[in-house]
């Protein structure tokens, strides 16, 4: 292998956690000088202990707090299309075991061996989020690997991920192959969802909530459900497919609600499905004053605490959401609360939610806790890859 740059740990920084499996190296862990700062972002670099013992091969970016991402423990590895194909094959084998239909998260970043890379599959369409500099640089190789394995009709580079700005990357979405102006149909939990992969939120659909949708659907059988912060109707359409008598979706985005309506129509649920456009807190307050109550109330907001500085404000928002949602639950009904905030762990999120429920004068029992779907594996040394929390409560 040709000579590659070398990076070493600082004398006062232990490499132990990296040697035991932690996949990131921070800027204050290593010696950064004029030489290393000239290395282009996304370059593959050999990482060593301070006494020159090889650790592995990393993707280097001096412009990011995450200076290094472990690519391979073999310092002589060649990171190319074939290397990426092997990672995709391993990830695909797991998804084929889990799902009958080709709609899922194919690559979940470090947990699937492709640091900083998200790939969602919508049948013959693939949405790639290269959220690390190396992946952005190697999009041609990632594209080639997808072509070899899947021969897809559509490959979209989605550059909307917040992490890209932390890597010094742009936010330009590009169709690398094919195009799609119309929403794509996704069959999931016996319902049909509409995914706008080019103009919708994130990659177009939240596969991470699939199992939580299914569990909630059981609770709604024979009753009513309101899906607050609904996006394209994830919880509500699944509930209708499982026997809910009515479902209401609440969101501030009319395009998202339009997709939810199209999904309800395609699923045959149009007569039992309704929507409210507006601020979720205002809509919940209005519905409470109007005397509306539901067998199941779901509150699945965007990240109220996306970072540590936003944590306290975010927890207050989760408390408020739980308080208002609790008031809409019928006696003996169910409350489903979700958080996708990295900064708020389950303990903090649960505490804020229970305080809110208590302030609403409601009591109950936790019957289940959920996380991201099984196509979102968790890196065993990276708590950040486990971000989604869900609490299911039965209220008195």
Task: Locate each region found by the language model.
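Conserved class I S-adenosyl-L-methionine
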Residues: 222-231
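S-adenosyl-L-methionine
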Residues: 255-296
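Conserved SAM-binding motif I beta-strand of class I
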Residues: 246-251
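Non-catalytic substrate-recognition/targeting regions of SAM-dependent transferases
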Residues: 107-120, 136-205, 214
């Amino acid at each position: 292998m040709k000579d590659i740059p070398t990076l070493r740990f600082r004398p006062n920084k232990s490499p132990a956690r990296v040697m035991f499996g932690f996949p990131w190296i921070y800027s204050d862990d290593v010696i950064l000088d004029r030489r290393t700062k000239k290395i282009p972002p996304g370059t593959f670099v050999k990482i060593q202990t301070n006494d020159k013992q090889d650790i592995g091969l990393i993707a280097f970016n001096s412009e990011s707090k995450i200076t290094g991402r472990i690519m391979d423990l073999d310092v002589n590895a060649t990171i190319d299309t074939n290397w990426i194909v092997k990672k995709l094959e391993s990830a695909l084998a797991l998804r084929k075991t889990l799902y009958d239909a080709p709609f899922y998260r194919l690559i979940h970043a470090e947990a699937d061996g492709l640091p900083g890379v998200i790939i969602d599959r919508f049948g013959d369409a693939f949405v790639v989020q290269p959220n690390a500099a190396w992946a952005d640089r190697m999009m041609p190789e990632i594209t080639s690997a997808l072509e070899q394995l899947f021969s897809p009709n559509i490959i979209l580079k989605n550059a909307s991920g917040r992490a890209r700005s932390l890597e010094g990357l742009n936010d330009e979405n590009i169709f690398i192959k094919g195009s799609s102006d119309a929403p794509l149909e996704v069959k999931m939990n016996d319902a049909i969802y509409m995914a706008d992969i080019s103009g919708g939120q994130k990659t177009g659909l939240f596969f991470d909530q699939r199992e939580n949708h299914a569990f909630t659907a059981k609770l709604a059988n024979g009753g009513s459900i309101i899906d607050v912060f609904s996006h394209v109707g994830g919880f509500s359409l699944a509930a209708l497919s499982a026997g809910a008598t009515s479902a209401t979706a609440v969101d501030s985005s009319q395009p998202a609600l339009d997709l939810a309506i199209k999904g309800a129509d395609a699923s045959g649920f149009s007569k039992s499905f309704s929507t409210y456009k507006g601020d979720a807190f205002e809509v919940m307050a209005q519905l409470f004053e109007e005397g509306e109550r539901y067998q199941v109330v779901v509150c699945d907001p965007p990240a109220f605490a996306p970072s540590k500085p936003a944590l306290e404000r975010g927890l207050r928002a989760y408390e408020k959401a739980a308080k208002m949602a609790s008031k809409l639950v019928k006696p003996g009904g169910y409350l489903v609360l979700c958080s996708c905030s990295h900064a708020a762990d389950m303990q903090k999120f649960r505490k804020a939610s229970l305080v809110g429920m208590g302030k609403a004068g409601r009591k109950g029992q936790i019957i289940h806790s959920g996380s991201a779907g099984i196509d979102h594996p968790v890196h065993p040394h990276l708590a950040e890859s486990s971000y989604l929390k869900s609490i299911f409560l039965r209220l008195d």
